């Protein structure tokens, strides 16, 4: 699992997590989760 951090258009920090096949990703709003 690879994980990278980007900022979205509003400047919020977003964690992009690729799943096992590496095609899809889950975006997590870090401001909401902690």
From Swiss-Prot:
It comes from the Eukaryota. This is Non-cysteinic peptide Bs 10. Belongs to the non-disulfide-bridged peptide (NDBP) superfamily. The keyword Secreted applies. The lineage of its organism: Eukaryota, Metazoa, Ecdysozoa, Arthropoda, Chelicerata. Residues 1-34 are annotated as: Disordered. It is found in: Secreted. Residues 14-23 have a biased composition (Basic residues).
């Amino acid at each position: 699992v690879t994980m990278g951090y980007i900022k979205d258009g509003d400047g919020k920090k977003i964690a992009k997590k690729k799943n096992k096949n590496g095609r899809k990703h889950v975006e997590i709003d870090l401001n909401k989760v902690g």
